[in-house]
């Protein structure tokens, strides 16, 4: 218990007390209006956000002047219509302040991480928390495990829970009051961390603010798992304290012992199974084990009790299913993953005797659900609900090459993201939809037919829809030494998958 108490001890010297004045600095809004967080796999235009037209140094200065002239910035929501700051341009100015506020609130987290990097060696631990650790887990570990449980991170029942979570990190009272103001202004922010919603479905003009709140909530829910993983003999680490400094956390652990009517050290042995694995992507995580079904049930029970008693998070146990890997498929990272038992017969010749031996090998498979992928293409208006390609409206001054490049880049992005699929037939259907949608768009622009347009462009049009690996392999390998079908059956995981992807968020 002394080790746990020291492990969770708060470093008061790193708490940030003077964040609120940064709202009056122009460079904060310059950082906030960086469009990097708003990237989309379909390259949706940013004009609808209003940044390109309105976001300028003059408007930022005007905003700061209004905040200086205001007697009190933090006001009740009921009086917001009478206030000059959030009156006529309430939506736009509130958007600017909320995104600038998100940048400011990220500062304490960044400073603590940099400090930990300077003081400790966290290379191994950092890799464990990276999305890149998911790929080797799928390829090397999952096929050897027995049980899996895919769980949605529970969401808070009250907005004040989010404020209290950040209060453990930030002691700046005005910043916390401003946070309450924004949470009550955007009352629909509860959908931010509702399991059935994804971050990409949130209001785009407040995406950075919501992303910050979401990540803070995820770290809070994940904290107990990080600690238990550190205690495991298989995944020891010296840097978990970076993300585990929580007010009264030691008291919560003590209370957990009382609730479960068990000594904490006796309870901890349940989590020391070296075959228990944990991976997470956004709002969903997986617990997998080579152990028994009873071990998985104990993990489930402890996590549900811990979240409900100490984080006031409601998680329905009946929605946490424990399944055997060999007869269950789970949806994760945009793939429908499963472990299949492949049997084969091997013939052995020994002198005059011959034998036939049956061998069984667990094989990990990943499939791209065609319904989810087609649904995203329908949402982007490249085809109708039946999957038939349709033309898109384009600007009159757009050149043919720009239109073709845009359609080709969209397909390459989708193919790049889903290159880890065991079977590529779904991607061929998407290529057909995008290619024909592009042809219909160009034919509509030139007031021609699709057939005539394709005949005029010829093979140059088809080459725009080749993926990078298809182009490279066609140049490096001879057809007889590297059959084309082989490249379509091999899984390729790209480590630059860092953008938020709509297809990976829905089950």
UniProtKB/Swiss-Prot annotation:
Q: What is its main location?
A: plastid
A single GO cellular-component term on record: chloroplast
Where can this protein be found?
Plastid, Chloroplast
GO BP annotations of the record are:
mRNA processing; RNA splicing; tRNA processing
Keywords carried by this UniProt record: Chloroplast, mRNA processing, Plastid, RNA-binding, tRNA processing
Regions that span the bilayer: none
Family matches, as InterPro entries: Domain_X, Maturase_MatK, Maturase_MatK_N
Which domain of life does this protein belong to?
Eukaryota
The GO terms this record gives for MF are:
RNA binding
Q: Which family does it belong to?
A: Belongs to the intron maturase 2 family. MatK subfamily.
Role according to the record? Usually encoded in the trnK tRNA gene intron. Probably assists in splicing its own and other chloroplast group II introns.
Any idea what this protein is called?
A: Maturase K
Record the organism. Answer: Liriodendron chinense
Tell me the lineage of the source organism. Answer: Eukaryota, Viridiplantae, Streptophyta, Embryophyta, Tracheophyta
> What would be the name of the gene that encodes this protein?
matK
């Amino acid at each position: 218990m002394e080790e746990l108490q020291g492990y969770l001890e708060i470093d008061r010297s790193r708490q940030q007390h003077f964040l609120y004045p940064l709202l009056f600095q122009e460079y904060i809004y310059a950082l906030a209006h960086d469009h990097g967080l708003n990237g989309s796999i379909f390259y949706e235009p940013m004009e609808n956000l209003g940044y390109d037209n309105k976001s300028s140094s003059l408007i930022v200065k005007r905003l700061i002047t209004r905040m200086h002239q205001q007697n009190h910035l933090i006001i009740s929501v009921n009086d917001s219509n009478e206030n000059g700051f959030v009156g006529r341009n309430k939506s736009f100015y509130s958007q600017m302040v909320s995104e600038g506020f998100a940048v400011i609130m990220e500062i304490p987290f960044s400073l603590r991480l940099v400090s930990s990097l300077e003081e400790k060696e966290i290379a191994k631990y950092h890799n464990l928390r990276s999305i890149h650790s998911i790929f080797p887990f799928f390829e090397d570990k999952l096929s050897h495990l027995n049980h899996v449980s895919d769980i949605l991170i529970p969401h808070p029942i009250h907005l004040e829970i989010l404020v209290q979570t950040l209060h453990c990190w930030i002691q700046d009272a005005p910043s916390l009051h401003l946070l309450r103001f924004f949470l009550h202004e955007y009352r629909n922010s509860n959908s931010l961390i509702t399991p059935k919603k994804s971050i990409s479905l949130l209001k785009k003009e407040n995406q950075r603010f919501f992303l910050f709140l979401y990540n803070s909530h995820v770290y809070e829910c994940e904290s107990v798992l990080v600690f238990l993983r550190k205690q495991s003999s298989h995944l020891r680490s010296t840097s978990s304290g970076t993300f585990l400094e929580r007010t009264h956390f030691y008291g919560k652990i003590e209370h957990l012992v009382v609730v479960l009517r068990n000594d904490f050290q006796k309870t901890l042995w349940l989590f020391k199974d070296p075959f228990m694995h944990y991976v997470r992507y956004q709002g969903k995580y997986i617990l997998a084990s080579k152990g028994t079904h009873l071990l998985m049930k104990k993990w489930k029970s402890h996590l549900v009790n811990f979240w409900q008693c100490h984080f006031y998070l409601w998680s329905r146990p009946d929605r946490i299913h424990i399944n055997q890997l060999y007869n269950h498929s789970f949806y994760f990272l945009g793939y429908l993953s499963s472990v299949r038992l492949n049997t084969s017969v091997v013939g052995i010749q020994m002198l005059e005797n011959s034998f036939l031996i049956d061998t069984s090998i667990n094989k990990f498979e990943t499939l791209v659900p065609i319904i989810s992928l087609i649904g995203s293409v329908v949402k982007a208006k490249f085809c109708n609900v039946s999957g038939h390609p349709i033309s898109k409206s384009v600007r009159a001054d757009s050149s043919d090459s720009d239109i073709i490049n845009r359609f080709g880049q969209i397909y390459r992005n989708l193919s790049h993201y889903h290159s880890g699929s065991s079977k590529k037939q779904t991607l061929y259907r998407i290529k057909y939809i995008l290619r024909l949608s592009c042809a219909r768009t160009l034919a509509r622009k030139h007031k021609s037919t699709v057939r005539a347009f394709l005949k005029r462009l010829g093979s140059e049009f088809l080459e725009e829809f080749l993926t990078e690996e298809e182009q490279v392999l066609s140049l490096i390998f001879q057809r007889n030494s590297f059959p084309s079908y082989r490249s379509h059956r091999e899984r390729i995981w790209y480590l630059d998958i860092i953008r938020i992807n709509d297809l990976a968020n829905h089950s």
